[in-house]
């Protein structure tokens, strides 16, 4: 099972958890969770006017062995309006490249942050991948 929690944070309410959303999916091949502005395609949806987040920004996908990965999907622009950082609990944050994929270790937990390049807004997605 993969469990996600998401909070949309602006500079004025840093640290607030109001508006937190949660989603989960079983660790079955082909299971998918998405994060983005498109409420029809994404289980976790950001505010509509946060244009630094793509319609479908992050895709969590379960592979054939029941392991999960996250991909920052490429959008229509060559130069994205955001940066994405990935960190496991206890580890240093590292950049997730535009179009890049990171594996989520079984039993692992951490956070993925989508940061607006032009302002203080961010989308913080916490994850826990049950072993």
For every predicted segment, state its role.
Residues 1-51, 61, 65, 101-131:
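Intrinsically disordered, low-complexity acidic Ser/Thr-rich regulatory segments
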Residues 57-59, 63-115:
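Forkhead-associated
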């Amino acid at each position: 099972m993969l469990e996600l929690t998401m909070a949309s944070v602006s500079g004025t309410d840093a640290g607030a958890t109001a508006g937190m959303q949660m989603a989960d999916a079983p660790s079955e091949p082909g299971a998918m969770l998405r994060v983005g502005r498109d409420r029809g395609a994404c289980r976790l949806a950001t505010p509509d006017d946060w244009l630094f987040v793509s319609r479908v920004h992050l895709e969590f996908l379960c592979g054939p062995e029941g392991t999960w990965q996250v991909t920052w999907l490429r959008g229509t622009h060559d130069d994205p309006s955001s940066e994405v950082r990935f960190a496991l609990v206890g580890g240093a944050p590292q950049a997730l490249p535009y179009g890049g994929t990171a594996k989520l270790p079984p039993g692992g937990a951490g956070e993925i942050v989508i940061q607006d390049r032009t302002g203080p807004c961010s989308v913080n997605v916490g994850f826990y991948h049950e072993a």
